[in-house]
């Protein structure tokens, strides 16, 4: 039998992952489009400011729901759910980073900017992506280590 609180928390974690990924992809998409097609900065800010408060509000509501559901679980189950959440958000972040790199390459082929500028942007994006992914992987291993110590 499935613990209903664990199922609710897991489902809310998955929805949080979707909203975080959407926000991440939205910002990356707008910035990359701005770099290659030089759209108006006010439009960039407006696009981000319209969507982000809605996404942040939904994430906040869902985080409160997850916190409520986690109060009913044992500490082992909490860490197990956190491991799953961190693993899923890491995978979706890596997917977003790779999709953004592919988009940058396609935009460079279609609407080229200076090669040195493109390479610097690509290197900066890769560095940011690797650092962010490394932090997520470190968080996963720390949570996994705590989970293993609780299992013993």
Curated annotation (Swiss-Prot):
Asked whether the UniProt record includes Lipoprotein among its keywords, one would answer no
Xref: InterPro entries: DUF5418
Q: Where in the cell is it found?
A: Cell membrane
Q: What's the superkingdom here?
A: Archaea
Q: Which residues cross the membrane?
A: 15-35, 43-63, 117-137
GO cellular component: a single term: plasma membrane
Keyword tags: Cell membrane, Membrane, Transmembrane, Transmembrane helix
Q: What is its main location?
A: membrane
The protein's matches in Pfam families, at most eight in alphabetical order, are given as:
DUF5418
Query: Membrane topology type, per the record?
Result: Multi-pass membrane protein
Similarity remark: To M.jannaschii MJ0129 and MJ0587.
Name used for this protein in its record: Uncharacterized protein MJ0554
Q: Give the taxonomic lineage as stored in the record.
A: Archaea, Methanobacteriati, Methanobacteriota, Methanomada group, Methanococci
């Amino acid at each position: 039998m499935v613990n209903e609180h664990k199922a609710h928390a897991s489902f809310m974690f998955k929805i949080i992952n979707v909203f975080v990924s959407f926000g991440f992809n939205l910002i990356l998409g707008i910035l990359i489009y701005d770099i290659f097609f030089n759209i108006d900065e006010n439009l960039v800010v407006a696009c981000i400011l319209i969507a982000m408060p809605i996404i942040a509000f939904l994430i906040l509501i869902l985080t409160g729901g997850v916190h409520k559901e986690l109060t009913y679980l044992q500490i082992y189950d909490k860490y197990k759910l956190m491991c799953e959440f961190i693993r899923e958000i890491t995978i979706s972040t890596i997917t977003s980073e790779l999709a953004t790199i592919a988009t940058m390459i396609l935009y460079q082929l279609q609407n080229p900017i200076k090669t040195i500028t493109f390479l610097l942007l690509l290197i900066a994006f890769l560095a940011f992506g690797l650092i962010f992914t490394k932090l997520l992987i470190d968080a996963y291993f720390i949570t996994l280590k705590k989970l293993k110590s609780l299992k013993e």
